[in-house]
């Protein structure tokens, strides 16, 4: 295809942020740059500076909703001054400034429909923003067939033929690192098997159920450790600080850098992720599997679609059942090894080349129909 001028608008972007949406846009940014396209990114600055002249990081107030005026005003101004062949927004928060800049044709990515699926979202504007972004988008991409169908279910007026599933992908750096894992374990002064969670500390992530399951499993396996990586969201900040005081036997790692994450995955004997809502793909379990760590996760539709039989699936909000699966897997070395070996070929399908090629087809379709 001809070389394109592309602009990605994404509130978060890796390695400054570690959420799946941020990693997705970093992955496609790298792919299209490597293909020789002129690609720009507009994003917020949350944790660290990204030293790339093609990535514009906007200084924002790092609190819920306080980022809104700064990010939107700077993005609108930038989009009104510059012309692009493709403008692609990451989630409704990335799409809104595109619409406000009066850009009539653009592509959006919807990763999940959390505000429709959960009861903890008390602000109806989040649902309205998703509907607004979906209805205004020329085309929409998702990371699973489940989310593609969910968009049509919750927003019936949208044409299903403008929604495209790309899945997601992982980087080559996610591979077993036994030496680095052992060194990390020694640095953290951890002895015994490790139950690992890496992700946002959010209510819908089922983190409290993971802690309950760990406490149950620890009665059967006293040497068991729980390592939790990730930062709390706005709603969970106070609870997270209380946990750190209450659970002295749990290692709360906080924000883990991109460079360190593969070693953490490799250090775990089991990776657990236990969301009960708002998951469109499930990137962290794929990364963990690639690092040679077996996975236990909730039996949400997106996880069943993406992981299939390459993880142990447990119904959400059942910490006792989760604990039983943790105990059984830790006591069954052959089953752990079987899960690891069986999944190695499976994870190879999730590459940025595969995602990028699908997106190239959609971009060409977009250009042809402008």
Where would I find each of the regions flagged by the language model?
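Short His-centered aromatic/hydrophobic patch
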Residues: 89-94, 110
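Short alpha-helical donor nucleotide-sugar binding micro-motif in glycosyltransferases
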Residues: 134, 255-256, 263-268, 283
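Short hydrophobic beta-strand element within catalytic cores of glycosyltransferases
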Residues: 294-297
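A short, active-site helix/loop in glycosyltransferases that binds the activated sugar's phosphate group
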Residues: 135-162, 170-172
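Conserved donor-binding/catalytic core segment of Leloir-type glycosyltransferases
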Residues: 7, 141, 189-205, 211-214, ...
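Conserved acidic donor-binding segment of nucleotide-sugar-dependent glycosyltransferases
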Residues: 312-319, 328-334
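Glycosyltransferase donor-sugar binding loop
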Residues: 45-47, 170, 198, 225-238, ...
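Nucleotide-activated donor-binding/catalytic signature segment of Leloir-type glycosyltransferases, i.e.
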Residues: 238-259
């Amino acid at each position: 295809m001809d070389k394109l001028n592309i602009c990605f608008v994404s509130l978060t972007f890796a390695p400054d942020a570690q959420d799946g949406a941020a990693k997705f846009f970093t992955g496609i940014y790298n792919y299209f740059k490597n293909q020789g396209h002129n690609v720009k990114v507009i994003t917020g600055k949350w944790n660290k500076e990204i030293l790339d002249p093609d990535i514009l990081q906007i200084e924002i107030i790092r609190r819920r909703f306080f980022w809104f005026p700064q990010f939107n005003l700077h993005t609108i101004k930038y989009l009104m001054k510059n012309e692009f062949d493709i403008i692609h927004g990451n989630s409704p928060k990335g799409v809104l400034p595109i619409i406000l800049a009066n850009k009539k044709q653009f592509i959006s990515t919807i990763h999940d429909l959390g505000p429709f699926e959960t009861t903890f979202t008390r602000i109806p504007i989040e649902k309205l923003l998703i509907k607004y972004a979906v209805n205004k988008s020329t085309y929409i991409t998702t990371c699973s067939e489940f989310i593609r169908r969910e968009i049509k279910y919750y927003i019936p007026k949208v044409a299903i033929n403008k929604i495209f599933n790309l899945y997601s992908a992982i980087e080559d750096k996610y591979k077993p690192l036994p030496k680095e894992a052992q060194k990390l374990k020694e640095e953290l002064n951890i002895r015994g098997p490790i139950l690992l969670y890496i992700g946002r500390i959010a209510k819908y992530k089922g983190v409290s159920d993971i802690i309950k399951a760990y406490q149950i499993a620890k009665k059967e396996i006293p040497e068991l450790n729980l390592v939790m990586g990730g930062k709390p969201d706005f709603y969970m900040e106070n609870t997270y600080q209380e946990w750190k005081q209450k659970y002295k036997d749990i290692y709360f790692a906080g924000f883990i850098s991109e460079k360190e994450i593969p070693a953490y995955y490799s250090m775990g004997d089991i990776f657990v992720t236990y969301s009960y809502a708002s998951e469109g793909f499930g990137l962290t379990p794929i990364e963990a599997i690639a690092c040679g760590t077996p996975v236990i996760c909730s039996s949400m539709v997106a996880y069943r679609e993406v992981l299939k039989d390459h993880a142990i699936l447990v119904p959400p909000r059942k910490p006792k059942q989760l604990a039983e699966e943790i105990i059984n897997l830790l006591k069954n070395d052959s089953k752990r090894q079987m899960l690891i070996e069986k999944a190695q070929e499976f994870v190879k399908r999730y590459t940025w080349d595969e995602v990028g090629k699908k997106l190239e087809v959609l971009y060409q379709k977009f250009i042809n129909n402008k």
